[in-house]
Amino acid sequence: MLFLVISTPAPTPPSSVRDKRQLYWKWVQPLRDDGTVRAIYARIGRGAVALFDIDTLQTLHQRLNEWADIIPATFEIHPLLDVDAAQAFLTTSAQGSQAG
């Protein structure tokens, strides 16, 4: 399951969380390496945007709690369909509407 996660860190001075920010990148690297995080980008100012490929909602919950333990943040979460799944859905739904 694909999820786009946008983080907005708690409002603290960036210099006060510099070490935590470095720890965050060390935490996320193994997730990038194993494909759990397909892509990640730092946001201009503060925060990050990550594309998670997760097997269960419980796993997503675990990862977001790990993330928030390092850098307290609020998360905007968007479930996604990959292109192949979206096209398959459109094909199936078009066939269903033609059958009636």
Label the predicted regions.
Residues M1-G100:
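Conserved, structured core segments of small domains
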